[in-house]
Amino acid sequence: MGCIVGPNGKGGDALYFNFNQDGAPLFLVQVDPDTGEARQFNAPQGPGAWALIAGPDEKIYLGTWDGGLILRFDPRQPEKGIEVVGRPAASESYLWQYDVGKDGKLYACTYPQAKLVSFDPATGKMEDLGRMHPTEMYARSLAVGPNGKVYVGIGTEMGDLVVYDPATKQHRSIMPEKFRNTAPGNFVGVTRRSDGQIYVACHAGLLRVDDESVTRVESAPELPPLKLRDGREVTAFGRGSFSLRDPKKGKVAERTFKYSGAGDMIFVVGTGPGGTIYGSTALPLEVFRFDPRVGRSEHLGGMPGGEVYSILDHANQVYLCYYGGAVMNLYDPAKPLWKFGTGADCNPISFGGVGDGHLRPRAMIRGPGGLIYIGSEPPYGQLGGAMAVWDPQQNKTIENYRNLVTNQSIVSLAWEPKSGLIFGGSGNWGGGGTRPTEKEARFFAFDPQQKRKVFEAALAPGAGSYPATAAADGKVYTTVGDRLFTFDPQTMQLVRTNSLPGPQQQISLGRHRNGLLVGLTGRAVYVFDAMKGEVVHSAAAPAQILCGYALTDEAVYFGSGPRLWRYWLPRLEGSK
Protein backbone atom coordinates (compact mmCIF):
# COMPACT_ATOMS: atom_id res chain seq x y z
CA MET A 1 0.00 0.00 0.00
CA GLY A 2 2.91 2.36 0.56
CA CYS A 3 6.56 2.97 1.39
CA ILE A 4 8.28 5.44 3.73
CA VAL A 5 11.77 6.12 5.01
CA GLY A 6 12.07 5.80 8.77
CA PRO A 7 14.52 5.07 11.58
CA ASN A 8 15.87 1.54 11.83
CA GLY A 9 16.23 1.68 15.62
CA LYS A 10 20.03 1.60 15.41
CA GLY A 11 20.78 5.16 14.39
CA GLY A 12 20.28 4.63 10.67
CA ASP A 13 17.55 4.47 8.05
CA ALA A 14 15.25 1.73 6.89
CA LEU A 15 12.55 1.48 4.27
CA TYR A 16 9.14 0.44 5.53
CA PHE A 17 6.69 -1.25 3.18
CA ASN A 18 3.05 -1.59 4.18
CA PHE A 19 1.17 -4.62 2.79
CA ASN A 20 -2.54 -5.35 2.93
CA GLN A 21 -3.85 -8.89 2.50
CA ASP A 22 -7.03 -10.90 2.86
CA GLY A 23 -5.84 -14.20 4.27
CA ALA A 24 -4.51 -12.58 7.45
CA PRO A 25 -4.05 -9.08 8.93
CA LEU A 26 -1.74 -6.56 7.27
CA PHE A 27 2.01 -6.66 7.71
CA LEU A 28 4.96 -4.27 7.71
CA VAL A 29 8.32 -5.07 6.11
CA GLN A 30 11.46 -3.30 7.34
CA VAL A 31 14.12 -3.30 4.63
CA ASP A 32 17.81 -2.41 4.76
CA PRO A 33 18.26 0.03 1.85
CA ASP A 34 21.86 -1.08 1.27
CA THR A 35 21.35 -4.84 1.17
CA GLY A 36 17.64 -5.52 0.71
CA GLU A 37 17.65 -7.62 3.87
CA ALA A 38 14.08 -7.66 5.19
CA ARG A 39 12.26 -8.34 8.44
CA GLN A 40 8.52 -8.85 8.43
CA PHE A 41 6.14 -7.88 11.23
CA ASN A 42 2.54 -9.07 11.17
CA ALA A 43 -0.21 -6.92 12.68
CA PRO A 44 -2.68 -8.37 15.19
CA GLN A 45 -5.63 -6.58 13.55
CA GLY A 46 -6.59 -4.77 10.36
CA PRO A 47 -6.72 -6.05 6.76
CA GLY A 48 -4.85 -3.03 5.42
CA ALA A 49 -3.75 0.53 6.07
CA TRP A 50 -3.75 3.59 3.84
CA ALA A 51 -2.06 5.80 6.44
CA LEU A 52 1.66 5.24 7.10
CA ILE A 53 4.14 7.62 8.73
CA ALA A 54 7.28 7.85 10.86
CA GLY A 55 6.26 9.62 14.06
CA PRO A 56 8.18 12.26 16.02
CA ASP A 57 9.02 9.56 18.57
CA GLU A 58 10.88 7.57 15.87
CA LYS A 59 8.15 4.93 15.77
CA ILE A 60 6.20 3.81 12.72
CA TYR A 61 2.44 4.38 12.67
CA LEU A 62 -0.21 2.84 10.47
CA GLY A 63 -3.90 3.77 10.17
CA THR A 64 -6.21 0.97 9.13
CA TRP A 65 -9.38 0.55 7.18
CA ASP A 66 -12.17 -1.70 8.44
CA GLY A 67 -11.79 -0.48 11.99
CA GLY A 68 -10.04 2.89 11.87
CA LEU A 69 -7.25 1.71 14.18
CA ILE A 70 -3.93 3.34 15.03
CA LEU A 71 -1.15 0.73 14.92
CA ARG A 72 2.43 1.31 16.12
CA PHE A 73 5.81 -0.34 15.53
CA ASP A 74 8.91 0.56 17.56
CA PRO A 75 12.14 -0.14 15.60
CA ARG A 76 14.09 -0.01 18.87
CA GLN A 77 11.95 -2.83 20.28
CA PRO A 78 11.17 -5.02 17.28
CA GLU A 79 10.44 -7.98 19.52
CA LYS A 80 7.18 -6.25 20.53
CA GLY A 81 5.99 -6.32 16.92
CA ILE A 82 3.07 -4.18 15.76
CA GLU A 83 0.86 -2.99 18.60
CA VAL A 84 -2.70 -1.67 18.56
CA VAL A 85 -2.80 1.82 20.05
CA GLY A 86 -6.56 2.13 19.74
CA ARG A 87 -9.47 3.55 17.80
CA PRO A 88 -9.57 7.35 18.00
CA ALA A 89 -13.15 7.70 16.73
CA ALA A 90 -15.73 4.97 17.25
CA SER A 91 -17.74 6.16 14.25
CA GLU A 92 -14.88 5.92 11.75
CA SER A 93 -13.75 2.87 9.77
CA TYR A 94 -10.96 4.43 7.67
CA LEU A 95 -7.90 6.45 8.62
CA TRP A 96 -6.81 7.78 5.24
CA GLN A 97 -3.67 9.77 5.89
CA TYR A 98 -1.37 11.00 8.67
CA ASP A 99 0.71 14.11 9.18
CA VAL A 100 2.75 15.32 12.15
CA GLY A 101 1.70 18.59 13.77
CA LYS A 102 3.92 21.32 15.12
CA ASP A 103 2.63 20.25 18.54
CA GLY A 104 4.13 16.77 18.09
CA LYS A 105 0.76 15.09 17.60
CA LEU A 106 -0.25 12.80 14.77
CA TYR A 107 -3.30 13.99 12.84
CA ALA A 108 -5.40 11.73 10.61
CA CYS A 109 -8.39 12.28 8.32
CA THR A 110 -11.23 9.76 8.22
CA TYR A 111 -14.27 8.14 6.63
CA PRO A 112 -17.34 7.89 6.83
CA GLN A 113 -18.01 11.09 8.81
CA ALA A 114 -15.15 13.20 7.44
CA LYS A 115 -13.54 13.64 10.83
CA LEU A 116 -10.14 14.74 12.03
CA VAL A 117 -8.53 12.73 14.83
CA SER A 118 -5.28 13.09 16.72
CA PHE A 119 -2.84 11.03 18.76
CA ASP A 120 -0.19 12.41 21.09
CA PRO A 121 2.81 10.00 21.24
CA ALA A 122 4.11 11.81 24.33
CA THR A 123 1.00 11.19 26.44
CA GLY A 124 -0.74 8.35 24.59
CA LYS A 125 -3.94 10.39 24.32
CA MET A 126 -6.22 9.91 21.31
CA GLU A 127 -8.81 12.54 20.46
CA ASP A 128 -11.82 12.73 18.15
CA LEU A 129 -11.75 16.33 16.90
CA GLY A 130 -15.11 16.07 15.20
CA ARG A 131 -16.54 16.38 11.72
CA MET A 132 -14.76 18.70 9.35
CA HIS A 133 -17.89 18.97 7.19
CA PRO A 134 -21.52 18.67 8.29
CA THR A 135 -22.68 16.32 5.50
CA GLU A 136 -19.74 14.94 3.51
CA MET A 137 -18.33 11.45 4.21
CA TYR A 138 -14.72 11.76 3.06
CA ALA A 139 -11.94 13.70 4.73
CA ARG A 140 -9.52 12.18 2.23
CA SER A 141 -6.29 14.16 2.53
CA LEU A 142 -4.54 16.46 4.98
CA ALA A 143 -1.31 18.35 5.52
CA VAL A 144 0.13 20.48 8.32
CA GLY A 145 1.21 23.94 7.22
CA PRO A 146 4.22 25.98 8.36
CA ASN A 147 1.88 27.81 10.75
CA GLY A 148 0.94 24.55 12.51
CA LYS A 149 -2.61 24.56 11.19
CA VAL A 150 -4.05 21.38 9.69
CA TYR A 151 -5.56 21.59 6.20
CA VAL A 152 -8.10 18.94 5.22
CA GLY A 153 -9.42 18.02 1.76
CA ILE A 154 -13.12 17.08 1.70
CA GLY A 155 -15.28 15.13 -0.82
CA THR A 156 -17.08 13.71 -2.69
CA GLU A 157 -20.44 15.41 -3.33
CA MET A 158 -19.31 18.93 -2.44
CA GLY A 159 -15.54 19.25 -2.35
CA ASP A 160 -14.24 21.63 0.30
CA LEU A 161 -11.05 22.87 1.92
CA VAL A 162 -11.11 23.08 5.71
CA VAL A 163 -8.53 24.45 8.12
CA TYR A 164 -8.23 23.23 11.72
CA ASP A 165 -6.33 25.31 14.27
CA PRO A 166 -4.90 23.17 17.11
CA ALA A 167 -4.47 26.29 19.24
CA THR A 168 -8.18 27.12 19.26
CA LYS A 169 -9.56 23.66 18.36
CA GLN A 170 -11.76 25.39 15.79
CA HIS A 171 -12.19 24.58 12.13
CA ARG A 172 -13.77 26.33 9.18
CA SER A 173 -14.01 26.20 5.40
CA ILE A 174 -11.56 28.47 3.61
CA MET A 175 -12.40 27.55 0.02
CA PRO A 176 -13.21 30.81 -1.81
CA GLU A 177 -16.62 30.83 -3.45
CA LYS A 178 -15.09 31.43 -6.87
CA PHE A 179 -13.21 28.12 -6.58
CA ARG A 180 -16.10 26.04 -5.28
CA ASN A 181 -17.65 23.36 -7.45
CA THR A 182 -21.36 22.94 -6.79
CA ALA A 183 -21.66 20.01 -9.21
CA PRO A 184 -21.53 16.59 -7.53
CA GLY A 185 -18.51 14.36 -7.76
CA ASN A 186 -15.36 16.15 -6.69
CA PHE A 187 -12.50 15.74 -4.25
CA VAL A 188 -10.22 18.42 -2.92
CA GLY A 189 -6.67 17.12 -2.57
CA VAL A 190 -4.27 18.70 -0.07
CA THR A 191 -0.47 18.30 -0.12
CA ARG A 192 2.59 19.92 1.41
CA ARG A 193 5.22 20.42 -1.28
CA SER A 194 9.00 20.61 -1.12
CA ASP A 195 8.88 24.35 -0.33
CA GLY A 196 6.95 23.56 2.86
CA GLN A 197 3.79 25.30 1.64
CA ILE A 198 0.29 23.86 1.27
CA TYR A 199 -1.17 23.31 -2.19
CA VAL A 200 -4.63 22.20 -3.22
CA ALA A 201 -5.73 20.31 -6.33
CA CYS A 202 -9.39 20.70 -7.26
CA HIS A 203 -11.67 21.24 -10.25
CA ALA A 204 -10.56 24.90 -10.37
CA GLY A 205 -6.95 23.87 -10.88
CA LEU A 206 -3.99 24.27 -8.57
CA LEU A 207 -4.31 26.51 -5.52
CA ARG A 208 -1.78 27.74 -2.96
CA VAL A 209 -2.67 28.29 0.69
CA ASP A 210 -1.01 31.00 2.77
CA ASP A 211 -2.41 30.72 6.28
CA GLU A 212 -6.10 31.06 5.43
CA SER A 213 -5.73 32.84 2.10
CA VAL A 214 -6.19 30.78 -1.08
CA THR A 215 -4.96 31.82 -4.53
CA ARG A 216 -4.72 30.11 -7.89
CA VAL A 217 -1.24 29.26 -9.20
CA GLU A 218 0.01 27.86 -12.48
CA SER A 219 2.47 25.41 -10.97
CA ALA A 220 3.81 24.07 -7.71
CA PRO A 221 7.06 22.55 -6.48
CA GLU A 222 7.45 18.78 -6.51
CA LEU A 223 6.31 16.62 -3.64
CA PRO A 224 9.10 15.94 -1.13
CA PRO A 225 11.06 12.86 -2.20
CA LEU A 226 11.50 9.76 -0.08
CA LYS A 227 15.00 10.68 1.07
CA LEU A 228 17.54 8.92 3.26
CA ARG A 229 19.80 10.87 5.61
CA ASP A 230 22.76 10.51 3.23
CA GLY A 231 20.79 12.15 0.41
CA ARG A 232 19.84 9.05 -1.57
CA GLU A 233 16.26 9.00 -2.82
CA VAL A 234 13.72 6.23 -3.38
CA THR A 235 12.66 6.77 -6.99
CA ALA A 236 10.41 3.72 -7.40
CA PHE A 237 9.05 0.87 -5.34
CA GLY A 238 6.83 -2.14 -5.75
CA ARG A 239 5.97 -5.42 -4.11
CA GLY A 240 9.40 -6.79 -3.31
CA SER A 241 11.50 -4.19 -5.12
CA PHE A 242 12.77 -0.61 -4.92
CA SER A 243 15.16 1.77 -6.66
CA LEU A 244 17.59 4.16 -4.96
CA ARG A 245 19.14 7.13 -6.73
CA ASP A 246 22.38 8.61 -5.46
CA PRO A 247 22.42 12.27 -6.63
CA LYS A 248 26.11 12.60 -5.76
CA LYS A 249 27.16 9.74 -8.04
CA GLY A 250 24.28 9.99 -10.49
CA LYS A 251 23.64 6.26 -10.21
CA VAL A 252 20.48 4.25 -9.56
CA ALA A 253 20.60 0.97 -7.64
CA GLU A 254 17.75 -1.50 -8.01
CA ARG A 255 17.19 -3.97 -5.21
CA THR A 256 14.72 -6.67 -4.24
CA PHE A 257 13.50 -8.06 -0.94
CA LYS A 258 11.48 -11.05 0.18
CA TYR A 259 8.30 -11.29 2.22
CA SER A 260 5.62 -13.89 2.92
CA GLY A 261 1.94 -13.11 2.37
CA ALA A 262 -1.24 -15.03 3.16
CA GLY A 263 -2.89 -14.09 -0.13
CA ASP A 264 -4.78 -11.21 -1.71
CA MET A 265 -8.56 -11.06 -1.88
CA ILE A 266 -10.06 -12.48 -5.07
CA PHE A 267 -12.54 -9.87 -6.27
CA VAL A 268 -13.99 -11.42 -9.44
CA VAL A 269 -13.65 -14.57 -11.54
CA GLY A 270 -14.80 -15.26 -15.08
CA THR A 271 -14.52 -17.76 -17.90
CA GLY A 272 -11.82 -17.42 -20.56
CA PRO A 273 -11.03 -19.21 -23.82
CA GLY A 274 -10.96 -22.99 -23.76
CA GLY A 275 -12.67 -23.25 -20.39
CA THR A 276 -9.87 -21.47 -18.55
CA ILE A 277 -10.69 -19.42 -15.47
CA TYR A 278 -9.54 -15.82 -15.09
CA GLY A 279 -9.64 -13.76 -11.94
CA SER A 280 -8.53 -10.51 -10.36
CA THR A 281 -7.44 -9.65 -6.87
CA ALA A 282 -8.20 -6.31 -5.23
CA LEU A 283 -5.71 -3.73 -3.98
CA PRO A 284 -3.45 -4.62 -5.62
CA LEU A 285 -4.97 -5.59 -8.96
CA GLU A 286 -3.27 -8.79 -10.03
CA VAL A 287 -4.68 -11.05 -12.76
CA PHE A 288 -4.42 -14.83 -12.59
CA ARG A 289 -5.48 -17.77 -14.73
CA PHE A 290 -6.39 -21.33 -13.80
CA ASP A 291 -6.41 -24.08 -16.43
CA PRO A 292 -8.67 -26.97 -15.32
CA ARG A 293 -7.28 -29.21 -18.06
CA VAL A 294 -3.85 -29.37 -16.43
CA GLY A 295 -4.77 -28.20 -12.93
CA ARG A 296 -2.34 -25.30 -13.06
CA SER A 297 -2.75 -21.74 -11.78
CA GLU A 298 -0.51 -18.88 -12.85
CA HIS A 299 -0.07 -15.23 -11.99
CA LEU A 300 -0.22 -13.26 -15.25
CA GLY A 301 0.54 -9.74 -14.07
CA GLY A 302 -0.84 -6.51 -12.69
CA MET A 303 -2.68 -3.43 -13.91
CA PRO A 304 -2.85 0.03 -12.31
CA GLY A 305 -6.50 -0.05 -11.19
CA GLY A 306 -7.96 -1.16 -7.89
CA GLU A 307 -9.58 -4.37 -9.13
CA VAL A 308 -11.17 -5.86 -12.23
CA TYR A 309 -14.95 -5.62 -11.94
CA SER A 310 -15.98 -7.65 -14.99
CA ILE A 311 -14.46 -10.28 -17.28
CA LEU A 312 -15.68 -11.40 -20.72
CA ASP A 313 -14.38 -14.10 -23.05
CA HIS A 314 -14.56 -12.83 -26.65
CA ALA A 315 -13.08 -14.34 -29.83
CA ASN A 316 -10.40 -16.29 -27.95
CA GLN A 317 -9.37 -13.17 -26.07
CA VAL A 318 -10.37 -11.75 -22.70
CA TYR A 319 -11.81 -8.32 -21.93
CA LEU A 320 -10.97 -7.05 -18.45
CA CYS A 321 -12.71 -3.87 -17.26
CA TYR A 322 -11.37 -2.36 -14.05
CA TYR A 323 -12.03 0.25 -11.37
CA GLY A 324 -11.48 3.21 -11.36
CA GLY A 325 -12.77 4.83 -14.46
CA ALA A 326 -14.13 1.60 -15.97
CA VAL A 327 -10.96 1.14 -18.01
CA MET A 328 -11.29 -1.48 -20.76
CA ASN A 329 -8.39 -3.82 -21.53
CA LEU A 330 -7.96 -6.72 -23.95
CA TYR A 331 -5.70 -9.69 -23.18
CA ASP A 332 -4.61 -12.22 -25.81
CA PRO A 333 -3.65 -15.58 -24.24
CA ALA A 334 -1.88 -16.58 -27.47
CA LYS A 335 0.82 -14.00 -26.82
CA PRO A 336 3.48 -15.24 -24.38
CA LEU A 337 4.20 -12.17 -22.26
CA TRP A 338 2.16 -9.87 -20.02
CA LYS A 339 2.99 -6.28 -20.93
CA PHE A 340 0.32 -3.82 -19.81
CA GLY A 341 0.07 -0.58 -21.77
CA THR A 342 -1.58 1.36 -24.54
CA GLY A 343 0.81 0.53 -27.38
CA ALA A 344 0.05 -1.90 -30.19
CA ASP A 345 2.70 -4.27 -28.84
CA CYS A 346 1.16 -4.38 -25.35
CA ASN A 347 -0.71 -7.32 -23.88
CA PRO A 348 -3.09 -6.53 -22.34
CA ILE A 349 -3.67 -3.42 -24.38
CA SER A 350 -5.53 -0.71 -22.51
CA PHE A 351 -8.11 1.44 -24.30
CA GLY A 352 -9.04 3.83 -21.48
CA GLY A 353 -12.36 4.48 -19.80
CA VAL A 354 -15.60 3.42 -21.43
CA GLY A 355 -17.39 6.73 -20.87
CA ASP A 356 -19.22 9.22 -18.70
CA GLY A 357 -20.97 7.78 -15.66
CA HIS A 358 -18.76 4.70 -15.38
CA LEU A 359 -16.52 4.04 -12.38
CA ARG A 360 -17.20 0.47 -11.23
CA PRO A 361 -18.09 -1.67 -14.30
CA ARG A 362 -20.00 -4.40 -12.51
CA ALA A 363 -21.77 -6.00 -15.54
CA MET A 364 -20.32 -6.87 -18.96
CA ILE A 365 -22.14 -9.10 -21.48
CA ARG A 366 -22.32 -10.03 -25.14
CA GLY A 367 -25.21 -8.41 -26.98
CA PRO A 368 -26.68 -8.41 -30.48
CA GLY A 369 -24.41 -7.76 -33.44
CA GLY A 370 -21.33 -8.91 -31.57
CA LEU A 371 -21.37 -5.78 -29.43
CA ILE A 372 -20.52 -5.69 -25.72
CA TYR A 373 -22.71 -4.00 -23.11
CA ILE A 374 -21.21 -2.62 -19.89
CA GLY A 375 -23.19 -1.46 -16.86
CA SER A 376 -21.55 0.59 -14.13
CA GLU A 377 -21.82 2.45 -10.87
CA PRO A 378 -21.13 6.20 -11.21
CA PRO A 379 -18.07 8.13 -10.00
CA TYR A 380 -17.59 9.33 -6.43
CA GLY A 381 -20.05 11.96 -5.34
CA GLN A 382 -22.38 11.39 -8.30
CA LEU A 383 -25.74 9.73 -8.85
CA GLY A 384 -26.75 7.87 -11.98
CA GLY A 385 -24.55 5.17 -13.47
CA ALA A 386 -24.42 4.31 -17.16
CA MET A 387 -24.61 1.59 -19.79
CA ALA A 388 -22.02 1.65 -22.57
CA VAL A 389 -22.02 -0.20 -25.88
CA TRP A 390 -18.53 -1.33 -26.88
CA ASP A 391 -17.59 -2.33 -30.42
CA PRO A 392 -14.84 -4.99 -30.32
CA GLN A 393 -14.07 -4.39 -34.00
CA GLN A 394 -13.06 -0.81 -33.27
CA ASN A 395 -12.32 -1.33 -29.57
CA LYS A 396 -14.15 1.78 -28.50
CA THR A 397 -17.46 2.87 -27.02
CA ILE A 398 -19.98 3.66 -29.75
CA GLU A 399 -22.97 4.47 -27.51
CA ASN A 400 -23.31 5.48 -23.87
CA TYR A 401 -26.46 5.95 -21.82
CA ARG A 402 -26.03 7.92 -18.60
CA ASN A 403 -28.82 7.74 -16.00
CA LEU A 404 -30.52 4.89 -17.83
CA VAL A 405 -32.19 4.30 -14.49
CA THR A 406 -32.49 7.72 -12.89
CA ASN A 407 -30.00 8.30 -10.06
CA GLN A 408 -29.15 4.59 -9.87
CA SER A 409 -26.31 2.21 -10.72
CA ILE A 410 -26.45 -0.55 -13.35
CA VAL A 411 -25.42 -3.77 -11.58
CA SER A 412 -26.60 -6.64 -13.81
CA LEU A 413 -27.30 -7.20 -17.53
CA ALA A 414 -28.51 -10.00 -19.81
CA TRP A 415 -29.31 -10.25 -23.53
CA GLU A 416 -32.49 -12.13 -24.41
CA PRO A 417 -32.11 -13.07 -28.13
CA LYS A 418 -35.76 -13.88 -28.95
CA SER A 419 -36.97 -10.42 -28.02
CA GLY A 420 -33.67 -8.80 -28.97
CA LEU A 421 -33.73 -6.79 -25.76
CA ILE A 422 -31.09 -6.10 -23.15
CA PHE A 423 -32.49 -6.63 -19.66
CA GLY A 424 -30.90 -5.38 -16.50
CA GLY A 425 -31.18 -4.55 -12.86
CA SER A 426 -30.16 -1.47 -10.96
CA GLY A 427 -28.84 -0.73 -7.51
CA ASN A 428 -30.51 2.25 -5.89
CA TRP A 429 -27.18 3.77 -4.80
CA GLY A 430 -24.75 6.17 -6.42
CA GLY A 431 -21.02 6.71 -6.22
CA GLY A 432 -19.00 6.74 -3.02
CA GLY A 433 -19.91 9.54 -0.65
CA THR A 434 -23.51 9.84 -1.86
CA ARG A 435 -26.77 8.85 -0.24
CA PRO A 436 -29.52 7.09 -2.22
CA THR A 437 -32.30 9.38 -3.41
CA GLU A 438 -34.46 6.60 -4.85
CA LYS A 439 -36.42 4.28 -2.55
CA GLU A 440 -36.06 1.12 -4.61
CA ALA A 441 -34.07 -0.48 -7.40
CA ARG A 442 -35.57 -1.08 -10.84
CA PHE A 443 -35.68 -3.88 -13.41
CA PHE A 444 -35.54 -2.62 -16.99
CA ALA A 445 -35.43 -3.52 -20.69
CA PHE A 446 -33.44 -1.66 -23.35
CA ASP A 447 -34.07 -1.94 -27.09
CA PRO A 448 -30.77 -1.80 -29.05
CA GLN A 449 -32.65 -1.06 -32.28
CA GLN A 450 -34.61 1.87 -30.89
CA LYS A 451 -31.68 2.84 -28.66
CA ARG A 452 -33.93 3.51 -25.71
CA LYS A 453 -35.34 1.97 -22.56
CA VAL A 454 -38.70 0.33 -23.29
CA PHE A 455 -39.61 -1.04 -19.87
CA GLU A 456 -38.95 -0.29 -16.22
CA ALA A 457 -40.57 -1.59 -13.06
CA ALA A 458 -39.98 -2.49 -9.44
CA LEU A 459 -40.53 -6.25 -9.49
CA ALA A 460 -39.81 -6.31 -5.78
CA PRO A 461 -41.03 -3.14 -4.05
CA GLY A 462 -38.43 -1.75 -1.69
CA ALA A 463 -35.55 -3.85 -3.06
CA GLY A 464 -32.11 -2.26 -3.02
CA SER A 465 -30.72 -4.09 -6.06
CA TYR A 466 -31.09 -6.83 -8.68
CA PRO A 467 -27.61 -8.30 -8.34
CA ALA A 468 -27.78 -11.00 -11.04
CA THR A 469 -29.76 -11.34 -14.27
CA ALA A 470 -29.71 -14.07 -16.95
CA ALA A 471 -31.70 -15.14 -20.01
CA ALA A 472 -32.62 -18.67 -21.07
CA ASP A 473 -35.15 -20.20 -23.47
CA GLY A 474 -37.14 -17.05 -24.06
CA LYS A 475 -37.38 -16.01 -20.41
CA VAL A 476 -35.39 -13.62 -18.25
CA TYR A 477 -34.36 -14.42 -14.70
CA THR A 478 -33.39 -11.86 -12.11
CA THR A 479 -32.85 -11.87 -8.38
CA VAL A 480 -33.56 -9.90 -5.24
CA GLY A 481 -32.20 -11.16 -1.94
CA ASP A 482 -33.08 -14.84 -1.69
CA ARG A 483 -35.70 -14.75 -4.46
CA LEU A 484 -35.44 -15.71 -8.13
CA PHE A 485 -37.91 -14.04 -10.50
CA THR A 486 -38.99 -15.44 -13.86
CA PHE A 487 -39.96 -12.67 -16.29
CA ASP A 488 -41.69 -13.06 -19.66
CA PRO A 489 -40.30 -10.62 -22.28
CA GLN A 490 -43.32 -11.12 -24.54
CA THR A 491 -45.91 -9.99 -22.01
CA MET A 492 -43.51 -7.95 -19.87
CA GLN A 493 -44.93 -9.69 -16.83
CA LEU A 494 -43.49 -11.44 -13.81
CA VAL A 495 -44.64 -15.06 -14.05
CA ARG A 496 -42.96 -16.88 -11.17
CA THR A 497 -41.06 -16.35 -7.93
CA ASN A 498 -38.86 -19.02 -6.35
CA SER A 499 -36.94 -19.13 -3.10
CA LEU A 500 -33.16 -19.50 -3.17
CA PRO A 501 -30.82 -21.04 -0.58
CA GLY A 502 -29.67 -17.63 0.59
CA PRO A 503 -29.14 -14.11 -0.81
CA GLN A 504 -27.95 -14.04 -4.42
CA GLN A 505 -24.28 -13.25 -5.12
CA GLN A 506 -23.54 -10.45 -7.61
CA ILE A 507 -23.20 -11.31 -11.34
CA SER A 508 -23.38 -15.02 -10.49
CA LEU A 509 -26.24 -16.49 -12.52
CA GLY A 510 -26.02 -18.10 -15.94
CA ARG A 511 -27.33 -20.73 -18.33
CA HIS A 512 -25.48 -24.02 -18.47
CA ARG A 513 -25.23 -25.78 -21.83
CA ASN A 514 -27.81 -28.34 -20.61
CA GLY A 515 -30.38 -25.55 -20.31
CA LEU A 516 -30.36 -25.33 -16.53
CA LEU A 517 -29.56 -22.15 -14.66
CA VAL A 518 -26.62 -22.26 -12.26
CA GLY A 519 -26.26 -19.59 -9.59
CA LEU A 520 -24.44 -18.67 -6.42
CA THR A 521 -25.67 -17.33 -3.12
CA GLY A 522 -23.44 -16.23 -0.29
CA ARG A 523 -23.35 -19.77 1.05
CA ALA A 524 -24.47 -22.19 -1.65
CA VAL A 525 -24.45 -23.28 -5.28
CA TYR A 526 -27.89 -23.88 -6.77
CA VAL A 527 -29.34 -25.26 -10.00
CA PHE A 528 -32.72 -24.07 -11.30
CA ASP A 529 -34.78 -26.01 -13.85
CA ALA A 530 -36.89 -23.52 -15.81
CA MET A 531 -39.09 -26.24 -17.26
CA LYS A 532 -39.99 -27.53 -13.81
CA GLY A 533 -39.97 -24.06 -12.30
CA GLU A 534 -37.98 -25.10 -9.26
CA VAL A 535 -34.55 -25.33 -7.72
CA VAL A 536 -33.59 -28.94 -8.42
CA HIS A 537 -30.23 -28.98 -6.68
CA SER A 538 -28.32 -26.99 -4.09
CA ALA A 539 -25.09 -27.56 -2.23
CA ALA A 540 -23.78 -25.69 0.79
CA ALA A 541 -20.33 -24.20 0.25
CA PRO A 542 -17.59 -25.03 2.78
CA ALA A 543 -16.57 -21.35 2.78
CA GLN A 544 -18.41 -18.09 2.30
CA ILE A 545 -18.88 -17.27 -1.37
CA LEU A 546 -17.60 -13.73 -1.78
CA CYS A 547 -17.41 -13.38 -5.57
CA GLY A 548 -18.17 -15.10 -8.84
CA TYR A 549 -18.64 -16.23 -11.44
CA ALA A 550 -17.16 -18.71 -13.88
CA LEU A 551 -19.32 -21.49 -15.33
CA THR A 552 -17.86 -24.31 -17.43
CA ASP A 553 -19.36 -27.53 -18.73
CA GLU A 554 -18.29 -29.44 -15.63
CA ALA A 555 -18.09 -26.96 -12.77
CA VAL A 556 -18.74 -23.54 -11.31
CA TYR A 557 -15.93 -21.44 -9.80
CA PHE A 558 -16.01 -18.74 -7.14
CA GLY A 559 -13.71 -16.80 -4.84
CA SER A 560 -13.59 -16.81 -1.06
CA GLY A 561 -10.91 -14.56 0.39
CA PRO A 562 -7.62 -15.44 -1.30
CA ARG A 563 -8.81 -18.87 -2.47
CA LEU A 564 -10.39 -20.04 -5.73
CA TRP A 565 -13.03 -22.72 -5.21
CA ARG A 566 -14.58 -25.21 -7.62
CA TYR A 567 -17.85 -27.12 -7.35
CA TRP A 568 -18.34 -30.08 -9.68
CA LEU A 569 -21.85 -29.89 -11.08
CA PRO A 570 -24.07 -32.97 -10.81
CA ARG A 571 -25.33 -34.72 -13.94
CA LEU A 572 -28.70 -33.07 -14.40
CA GLU A 573 -30.66 -32.89 -17.62
CA GLY A 574 -32.52 -29.78 -18.69
CA SER A 575 -33.72 -28.24 -21.93
CA LYS A 576 -30.84 -28.11 -24.41
Go through each PLM region and give its residues.
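Beta-strand-rich domains and repeat architectures in extracellular enzymes and scaffolds
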Residues: 1-26, 264-266
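Repeated scaffold domains used in trafficking and secretory/extracellular systems
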Residues: 1-7, 47-53, 92-98, 136-143, ...
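Residue-level signature of beta-propeller blades and closely related beta-rich strand-turn architectures
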Residues: 21, 66, 112, 156, ...
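Blade-level signature of beta-propeller repeat domains, shared across WD40, Kelch, NHL, RCC1
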Residues: 541-576
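Short, conserved, GDST-rich strand-edge loop motifs in beta-rich repeat architectures
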Residues: 374-384, 424-440
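Conserved beta-propeller blade signature
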Residues: 14-18, 59-62, 105-108, 150-153, ...
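Surface loop/turn motifs at the tips and blade-to-blade linkers of beta-strand repeat domains
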Residues: 41-45, 85-91, 130-135, 175-182, ...
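A short loop-to-beta-strand structural motif that recurs across blades of beta-propeller domains
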Residues: 27-29, 69-71, 115-117, 160-162, ...
